[in-house]
Amino acid sequence: MAVPKRKKSKSRRNMHRSHCRLKVPNIGIDKTTGEYKLSHHVCLGGYYNEKQVLEVDSSNV
């Protein structure tokens, strides 16, 4: 079994774990509908960057 030759300091241990955390999703408000949406995603109304890119049935929304 592999064993470390020297003890890893608390600083180096924490730097090693710096990416191991929960990340907050990048949520913004859609300008056309006023609802929350993920950035760089199409909203439920079919809009992306204030332009309609998808035809959405009103019965599904």
Curated annotation (Swiss-Prot):
Highest taxon of source: Bacteria
Any GO BP: translation
Annotated Gene3D superfamilies: Single helix bin
Assigned keywords, A-Z: Ribonucleoprotein, Ribosomal protein
The keyword Ribonucleoprotein is assigned to this record: yes
Entry GO terms, CC: large ribosomal subunit
Protein name: Large ribosomal subunit protein bL32
GO molecular function: structural constituent of ribosome
Family: Belongs to the bacterial ribosomal protein bL32 family.
Pfam families, per database record: Ribosomal_L32p
Transmembrane segments annotated in the record for this chain: none
